[in-house]
């Protein structure tokens, strides 16, 4: 952010309007300014009656002239290539720009390359997919029929689209195919959309740009009460209304009484989300209206329609529930039902007293219930599912393998071991076979044979099927009683010895039952394979699972009657034999016949499985496939990452393999001890001057004011770097990444002091303009910024912030971390140490607080420490703790000679932000402590407000100035932030490698390095963590990095991209400073268990989750070449506390990631599925380790089947990491660490997860950070008291700066030194914060005496000088009035009242400029050439006859031509006395100073004080009651010179209206009674003879309420 330019509202194109192709769509209808009631009189473009802004230059009222001008422009465009930059005349030049000046003097201005900038880039034709915002806005305002071919609705469908990222429209025949059928522009935009807040920002600025300024500016759309939209309800676009009253993508507000959050579709605003507004009917900020345009909060009018029901001021306390505080939905009802047996009074007995604690406990029990259910489900799938669906399968014995100790009967195998035949028949007591076993006795030897024919069952299923031919009763038997061998052939048969059995024993054998009162044992079924059934030597068939031996039908006894089918079956028939005949039997209705066959011919059962058993096997193998697949893919992808990708990331030095191995060995040695310094070769030496004379560097600028035109040539195109961005076609056309800030043609925002074309850098002055602009504070001893060609590592540098969050660390820990960051090899000109001390706390055993420790490590403070005051900001807390205060100390890092040798002590800028708390918490144990997340949001929100120019607190204003004063770089130049914990030591080249990755690939939005353990062998607790750290990086993160989706960037060592370049036209996309990320990450209403675990314990991982959710197509990477070391817990108690926080936050963050639909991949082959498996695996860790131990123990038990598959799976899971170590790092020592880790698996997978789940409602940091006097019962984030926003004032940077300068006396209260330029162009043109007075604010007069600050002393100008320069010169000098007050510049007008407050508001409401302050021309009322010896009073230029006019870099003055210079020439002594000031005039047109023609207005920088409006005359602006005339003596008459001059020009035409400049956005503050958006009115134009119109004598009578009169003492 340029401290002298108005910050951009978004990364919007700035200059000119969007040119159309010659064959493009017809011109769209004009945009009616929201809130205006007038309609266009001209169908093409005509001003509404109540249009509160000045029409843009070149506006013609006649339609024919408009059409003629458009046709000329289209003919010029048709001669250009489509992708070529538009000609200067193809766009409406911004007011006050150099292009407008050229258009006024020359019909063919010199074409040049446009300046590329983040803030206000030269606008190329925007390439969109679908309708542009302008077309949509025109559609909203168009009242014509949809069928009208000239209506804007038709234009909506004809918008040309050429966005290669979003696909191409159908009529773009230059492309053969569309990239994607997904149309992001057709998404439903509601508050749940991942880019809801960011798109509202963009839409908000579109409305403001189209309205020529900040019409109806609302408070921040990402702050404490998001107000989505800028235009009032009913402005013509209200027909397309989205959630919250806002138009999806356009940001139109709804009715003022609609609750914020979106028409009931979003959760209502709860406690803590109230707007930082003021009381009703009071001014929004504390300064008076003379120093800012204000929006007054007015009550809703009682006339007209009856007002609707008001919104409660605090929606969070309007409703409460008996179940629990906070939101109550299905989840909370489930938790309450689950714990209904534990009412509140019962919980209070056990110390759970507050309703918030009881809610957290109930939610914890609900989660434990779900976790238990999931573990039970996993156990059921592992062990119980097979038993349930498959059951206990009977034992089966394959036919042909039955031993001699058993016999088969009707398909069942019976054991005859120990069987003694009863004493009947041949086995009688008096026979030789008494008490023998027939299976072993001759002649039977029936062992292994089929004895079914010995126990034939007569009747039953065969009744009526087989009968005697002669009739009568059932036959005695069907077959002869013989034995049958297993191959189906006959066995022993003796007709003389009866072998048939009758009685009950027959039924028992036929049914396969266990014989009663017998030693026979049923073993199981006899099974046959399908190859046995299809054997052509046998006649077998299968019916309902039973195998039938059809050959036995040949042995049927004679005299039996049976169906003819049996005659067919007893001979082998391919239609029946060898097949499953079940279906054929059912079709032919032969069930009875085959049931009889099953009774008499069954020999066994087909070897098959039930459907349940099949399902169990499918489940088993699918699980194996997924588990083994994921494990194997992770392993191979990690190997691929280690072999082919990891060494390329950040390898800017193109190291060889030997160099990489040497560096890895040095890092391993360095990581053994936390205090061991890195090898000296990696740490750069500090530069020392060898002479007492100052040495000038070609990169440094000792005095920014000494730069002259042509001091630096533009960077040659041959210096362009070939990055991934340029290869993809998104690089800057001038080379490198799109520049955003630094003032280098084609440079990044990193090259900050190199002057060129950019318009967003704080040092963005053009060398052509001769000097830098003015800075708000003098700069002393800042580190010079190198030029764009300075590439020490082969890539363009990017400004980076090294953020260190400190809480209760020791002195040694902080010194170690800051030493490592300060001695990194990254240039000090592009890095800033930022230490945020989270409260005034003392660590256990420490005598001084953490902020004091940090302050003791600083030197050369910009402001002495004793003079630093605390400033308020809105903290991330609840209750009164939302108000917090900070002290900002800016200086340089102070080394300790005992830790860093002098030769390595570089000069590094450092800022300390110490949270000191409010006076209410001065006596607490931790005043100012708000948590690490608050420290991160403090920086993120600040960067967002800087990028979007939103209202900021006093702390953020001081933070902005501190960064500027200590670095000389504006905060918006910073692109990367490195987050480091205060107990971490960074390897010297780690920052350079991280920045190299982000510069090379703009799609990377975050990355982390490898964290090594410095105390590996201290205790057994540290030893078990070594391999766990290693494998989490080189396997888990390496696998995720292959897809660019690392799900956890550790907070101890990670880098994030603040903003990313977008396209070749200088646009920037906020990443870390994105409104959606800041809005969700700064959630202060943490009232559910899920939110508390996300935001209070796992804030680092949640930030990664938010970035992946918001930007799922961007990359999160792991860079193993960037290394740090840290101290891990060395006692089990601390480890238990740490892992409790990590495990619980992991569970809740993985749940958030599972809900992201846009992660790469599809279904099972997606990162979302991998995340789901990780979430399930984390929840069932205790059950998994229990099952693992069960499988291992079972494998060693005898007589138990060995679980082969689970053992193989276990070996793969545990063994592959060891193989990974060997094949990637070749660090054999880690194999030993792996064995130690395997022995500690019960601790990692059972003890720690169970402890974490049971303490999920504990939100304290436990033993990890011990603070003196801390109450262990206090949970982090508890609400206490009520937040009072009246102590916090929020203003825009320009308002703070204006107030500071007024109070300090640097400028008069009405100075437009920091005025903000506004234009009426639909696309905001030009830069924003330009000075319209002389940039040399301390040298208003070119002659005379000056004080020590460079200010002109009273009466310093001699009369001769005054007469030489004409009557106007005396008006410019900063002389003092008799009362001692400094007189203000005559050429600088006063601010005026807002339009609705002025007495003549109704007369000028039709065409007055909205919120403008006019910069008048010189006293001459004619555009005739000025006298050659007169200078512009507002610029304080030197006379044409100045003795210094022919100095270096200055052009001679021709007669009749007025000249100017941005900075008057001064000698060296003046420059030394004068405070160093940096640039602010980031001009898009860096041409050298030239002669100004007689018809041109005087131009300063790129702000022209004259613009012509052919259709607007001064007569349209009547006299005003409150004027803004320069201060003159009302009784004084015009001097003779004036009279003569006015008389000479009395016949000249009336001077065109001077263009005004809007100071600030002044938007209303939301209230329960609605908001009436107040617009600032315009001052009237000056009359032809301004000298004849003195201002009223009473200068205070017309001041608005609350405004302080000017001081005259």
Swiss-Prot record:
Residues 1-326, 386-624, 1198-1202, 1249-1609 are cytoplasmic. Gene3D superfamilies: Spore Coat Polysaccharide Biosynthesis Protein SpsA, Chain A. PANTHER family: CHITIN SYNTHASE, CHITIN SYNTHASE 3. Glycans are attached at residues 654, 1015, 1144. This is Chitin synthase 5. GO terms for cellular component: cell periphery; cell septum; cytoplasmic vesicle membrane; plasma membrane. It is found in: Cell membrane; Cytoplasmic vesicle membrane. Disulfide bonds: none annotated. It is an enzyme of class 2 (transferase). Residues 61-82, 253-267, 742-752, 1568-1588 have a biased composition (Low complexity). GO terms for molecular function: chitin synthase activity. It is a multi-pass membrane protein. Residues 134-146, 307-320 have a biased composition (Basic and acidic residues). The chain crosses the membrane at residues 327-347, 365-385, 625-645, 1177-1197, 1203-1223, 1228-1248. Polymerizes chitin, a structural polymer of the cell wall and septum, by transferring the sugar moiety of UDP-GlcNAc to the non-reducing end of the growing chitin polymer. Belongs to the chitin synthase family. Class IV subfamily. Its main location: membrane. Induction: Expression is slightly lower in the yeast form than in the mycelium and shows a maximal expression in the log phase at about 14-18 h of incubation. One of its GO terms (biological process) is chitin biosynthetic process. Its EC number is 2.4.1.16. InterPro entries: Chitin_synth, CHS4-like_dom, Nucleotide-diphossugar_trans. It catalyses: [(1->4)-N-acetyl-beta-D-glucosaminyl](n) + UDP-N-acetyl-alpha-D-glucosamine = [(1->4)-N-acetyl-beta-D-glucosaminyl](n+1) + UDP + H(+).
